[in-house]
Amino acid sequence: MLKQIKTQLPSKEKFIATIQGKETALYYLKNKINLFAALTNYGARVVSLLVPDKNESLTDINVGFDTIEKYIDAEDQCYGATVGRYAGRIAGGKFSIDDIEYQLTVNNGANAIHGGNTGFQTRVWDANQINNQSVQFSYVSVDGEEGYPGKFTIKVIYTLTDNDELKMEFEYSSDKKTIANIINHNFYNLNGEESRDINHHLLQINSDRFNAINKDCIPTHLEGVKNTPFDFTSFHTIGERINANDVQIKNGAGYDHTFVLDNGVPTKPELAATVIGDLSGIAMEVYTTEPGVHFYTGNSMHGLHTFKSGVKDDYRTAF
């Protein structure tokens, strides 16, 4: 039994709006134990994720906002969102398929990032609440949107399972050859959104290699983690080496790197990483069928916005 509820889910009324000629809404999920979530079809994003801490107090570990307007106005449109058509940076905003070069919208210096100015995180998706534990969002990206070839159809299903999992399932297809890198961009603080600090969280990643980046955060080559600040093969605190005198730490202004997982490309979800909140005792295990996991430590948070709990989005408030 829960002893205390530190926070509540945001109000559905504060997520009602008309954007791009479509209605936005907030959807609640609850499993049969004590997990609760709130999600919106604006960006197919997670707004809240409430889980019990070591004292059985319900805690919101998903960093976000309490109104739809704050998401629309946010400098970073990715909080909790489904990001695409291609998450991450593409050098020069250019790529080639079958000797045809495509020019994307450039929106990060000289490069493209996170699908362009109108990436999936800025779109209103169609929504279908399947049951109390699942909701499906779907979107059709037209041929040429932000420079990407092909009509691209995507759906994501979020489920709170009775194994205390937030399960994310992505399905997509295109009628032309294209590129895609679809992610969920949740920001977490396992001590609770209001705690402000992630430096003492414990982290372990099942990876002995990572993608090195240049000063523009463009991946350049693979490097081994041994004897570097990127060795999380055993548990370390996030903040232990985050300011190390290391070229890769400096290029990312902290951690902003993809780790290549030891399991390769599994046919079923495999354990990629484990994070533990030092104060809450909340442990999060990340499972995936993908070959890598990206670790980012909120290095560009500037305190410009106010989260649901009333705290600012200060430097490294979440990961």
Feature annotation, model-predicted:
Residues 2-319:
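An exposed, glycine/acidic-rich loop-and-rim segment of catalytic or binding clefts
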